[in-house]
Amino acid sequence: MIRKVKKEIRVIGFDDGTFKFKARGDKVILVGVVMKGSLDVIGVVTRWITIDGLDVTDAIIDAVTSSRFKDLRVILLKGITYAGFNIVDVERVYKETGLPIIVVIRKKPDITSMELALKKHFNDYEMRIRLLKSAGTPIELIPGKLYYQAIGISREKAEEVIRITSRNALIPEALRLAHMIASAVMTGESTRE
């Protein structure tokens, strides 16, 4: 439980790399950037996850629990779908790491369209839809520009964490850097957040 959000709060932000869809089963890098507030990068963790697979939850749990970074206070996710429709089980990550999760989203997700795509392309669509819905309804923080979902943390504290960990962009710096690093690994060059 976070009593007070300090300026130097330790967070880890996860994002995957840009990828060209070739075939289900290919791998994409997942990068976690560990930061103290919005200024100091403390470290980086990586895992490989499967396009349209079901391994991102295990990858995040392993990256957090097996790392040397034992003073983390919050996990930041850039959405809950990675490598296509590899969907994070946010409730399981919260339970197994003991850390609150803040999912940050730039565009409000169209859940109906996502459900239709899942039904069309996946035999296990019911389970994937359940995972999508388990994060709750996105809350609008900056009208039309930034939304979030909070698991294991109050709305007020989640918004404070987002503000404190953001620097020159709308999203927390750990997420911005994770995106740049992951994209550079996958394509040879970083892409814009």
From Swiss-Prot:
- Span-the-membrane segments of this chain are none
Q: Which Gene3D superfamilies match?
A: archaeoglobus fulgidus dsm 4304 superfamily
Q: Which Pfam families match?
A: DUF99
Q: Which InterPro entries match?
A: Endo_dU
Coiled coil regions in record? none
Q: Which family does the similarity line name? A: Belongs to the UPF0215 family.
Question: NCBIfam families given for it?
Answer: PRK00766.1 (NF001977)
Q: What is this protein called?
A: UPF0215 protein PYRAB00790
